[in-house]
Structure formats: structure tokens, C-alpha cells
Amino acid sequence: MAQASKEESKKRHKELAPSSMFFQHNAALGPPYRVLVDTNFINFSLQNKIELVQGMIDCLYPKTNPCITTCVLSELEKLGPKYRIALRVARDPRFERLECTHKGTYADDCIIERIKSHKCYIVATCDRELRRRVRQVPGIPLMYIARHRYRIERLPDQGAPT
């Protein structure tokens, strides 16, 4: 009987990709993490009653620096009074402002351009289309909301257990 249980445990073992493989694509990523926040991530965080900075620390453990581009801020301003609370959260002094040099660019395109040129970010979004586009860039982790908690995808030795 002892042999049968050992064989079963061997069958259940799943090979994981070593975290060193991840850093072949992105050696610039390390604590304190810089999290590039999207418009809908702020909205979903408010709907799920998750405090952004504390939720990121709970997910990743080390210190995190949430970053927001001027394109995302302008997108929140354009959405009108319905999103004024999200705009107030985005203007929090704990958020690092990233100035954009381009004019009139869609916020998702701005985020993709930024992560392609500087691979030191984790992208926080709940937008399926943007998540698909970020997955095409090697070495960029994703943060999203699932079951009223932040989750991280494609980060070696992930933060909080599920």
C-alpha cells in the first residue's frame, strides 16, 4: 500500500517553469515593484471595496509603487462625474505620475508603448483585451482582480498564496 501511494504522488507532481526562465526576459523587475495601473483596475477595485495600495502589498508582499500615466488620468476625467471617486483615488499622492510625451493616444496604447520601452513594470488591469496584448510582451507580469482579491500572473515565486 505504501508503494501505491508513492506512485500516486509521483503522478500528481506537476513540473513548474523555473523562475530563472522568467528573468531571461526581464531582469529589471524587482522590489519595490512599480505597478502600472489602468482605468478599469481602479474602478473594479472600488466596486470590490479593495484599497489599492494595501491590496497590492497584500498580493506582492514587498513595497509597491503604483504608477499612473497622464493618459489614464485624462481618460478618467473624460468619463465624467460618474467616475469622480476613481479620479480622486488616481490623484492620490502615493501614486507616481508618469508624464506622456504623445498627445491624443488611447490609454491602453500608452501602457503598451511604455512596457515595451521600459520593462520594469507590473501591469494592473481587468480589461481582457489589454491583458491579451500585455501577454504578448515577454517578461511583463499582470495583476488583476479575482474573488475580491488582487491576483498576479506570470511573476516568479508569486506573492500571496491563493
Residue ranges: model-predicted function:
Residues 1-95:
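Domain-level signal for Mg2+-assisted phosphodiester chemistry and nucleotide/NA-binding surfaces
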Residues 67-162:
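Nuclease catalytic cores that cleave nucleic-acid phosphodiester bonds
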